[in-house]
Swiss-Prot record:
PANTHER family: 2-METHOXY-6-POLYPRENYL-1,4-BENZOQUINOL METHYLASE, MITOCHONDRIAL, METHYLTRANSFERASE. This is Ubiquinone/menaquinone biosynthesis C-methyltransferase UbiE. PROSITE patterns: SAM_MT_UBIE, UBIE_1, UBIE_2. The gene is ubiE. Belongs to the class I-like SAM-binding methyltransferase superfamily. MenG/UbiE family. HAMAP family: MenG_UbiE_methyltr.
Amino acid sequence: MPESRTSADGGMETSYGFREVPGGEKQDLVNQVFHKVAKRYDIMNDVMSMGMHRAWKDAMISALNPRKEPGYRVLDVAGGTGDIAFRIVEASGRQAHATVLDINGSMLGVGAERAEKKKLSGNLTFVEANAEELPFEPASFDAYTIAFGIRNVPRIDAALSEAYRVLKRGGRLLVLEFSEVDMPLLDRIYDAWSFNAIPQFGKAITGDAEPYQYLVESIRKFPNQENFAAMIRQAGFSRVTYTNYTGGIAALHSGWKL
């Protein structure tokens, strides 16, 4: 489970990669990371996943199986560039409406530009807000998705509680996230790739290795599959399951509001 600690001044601390920082400071630090990589976010995911994130996202959309009917509403959190939302809308035959929520305006700007180019603006709403305090009424959405974003939220338990609140009864939560590799040889290979190659590739692509170093460290600090599934259950979700992708490099977690 993610740990929060009390700092010397009495405030709560949380992990920012391998560092411990005041809870209120983590969000600002994460915002700086994604402001730096916003325009190269897809390339960043290619580097982080060795190109496999596209197949994982396709599997996520297949698992969601969005309904092909008007009125089907999905909230995609930490989805600023629109990658998941675009896939959902297309999979629904352009019937679904996706609300893309992100705390980072730079990421949302990239997503809005892409939506216009894809002629999907009518199916999308872009909202700048915090996953821990969603600006929506209870029971507003049929599905809640978040891909490679939950580990960057300072209070994951609060984000999961908010997900439960805004879902309709019968609504589904899907969380795609880097996870704990469960194959002995693969874990060593991926560790070597993560801590040696990824920051250097990031520096070559963006001129700055630091954001990539944080992202690698944040994966190691994130709860493993069983512990994160327990957090989802604790938030109130039922029928909680997870599916490992590529030996556990990533995992898709699913839960229902019943």
